[in-house]
A protein has these predicted regions:
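Short beta-strand micro-motifs within the conserved protein kinase catalytic domain, predominantly
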Residues: 48-60
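Activation segment signature within eukaryotic-like protein kinase domains
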Residues: 93-94
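Catalytic-loop of the protein kinase fold
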Residues: 105-122
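Activation segment/activation loop of eukaryotic-type protein kinase catalytic domains
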Residues: 117-166
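Conserved C-lobe activation region of Hanks-type protein kinase-like domains
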Residues: 173-203
């Protein structure tokens, strides 16, 4: 799709809620939080939202800079030697992810759900961080305990909207402690997958 004024190619994302009643409202609120948060984050290594979330009949749409693949797709393709990401591409991609996380951490923010689905590649081959619905401010964490409580309704959300515990820091899952180290653990899982044909370290 092209924007009418700039003629830049963009990616249009569409989501159709599947829940009913109160949980449908929670599902829509989660989607709005994700897109709104992403819209407010301005950094070259974070996915740029170019058109805000809009309701269209029974679905919701928004547009971002042009995306060609998620890292989940790229890592799956890497199983095939013919499509394996080379060392230079991996170095560039992980450096860009590190810069995005550094930007968040400097602002006292933690992504808390860095997975292969929350990293995408644009048309230029740049890796972009996205999926910011669970972005957590350290200012909201109790200073005496350093703990953060899960939202109860998260478990009732559709699977695609829940945290992916395969990438979650055990300190976060077991002790519910939030900090930049949560994202570093998840980044390590991604790096392992990228260098081991998409296999996770505990498989």
């Amino acid at each position: 799709m092209e924007q009418a004024l700039t003629r830049n190619t963009v990616s249009v994302w569409m989501y159709t809620p599947i829940s009913r009643g109160v949980m449908r409202t929670k599902e829509i609120e989660h989607l709005k939080r994700d897109v709104t948060t992403l819209s407010r984050l301005r950094h070259p290594c974070i996915l740029e939202v170019v058109e805000p979330l809009e309701e269209c009949r029974s679905s919701y749409l928004f547009a971002t800079e042009h995306v060609v693949a998620s890292s989940h797709e790229l890592l799956q393709d890497s199983v095939d030697p013919a499509h394996q990401l080379d060392e230079v591409e991996l170095q560039k991609g992980f450096l860009q992810l590190a810069r995005a996380l550094d930007f968040l951490h400097d602002a006292k923010l933690v992504h808390t759900n860095l997975t292969s689905m929350s990293v995408v590649m644009n048309a230029k081959g740049d890796w972009k961080l996205c999926g910011c619905a669970y972005l957590t401010s350290l200012a909201g964490v109790q200073s005496d305990s350093g703990r953060w409580a899960y939202e109860e309704e998260e478990h009732a959300l559709p699977e695609v909207m829940r945290r992916d515990m395969d990438f979650a820091d055990p300190v976060y899952v077991i002790d519910r402690r939030v900090g930049p180290y949560n994202d570093m653990y998840s980044l390590g899982i991604l790096f392992y997958m990228a260098t081991h044909h998409s296999a996770k370290p505990y498989q």
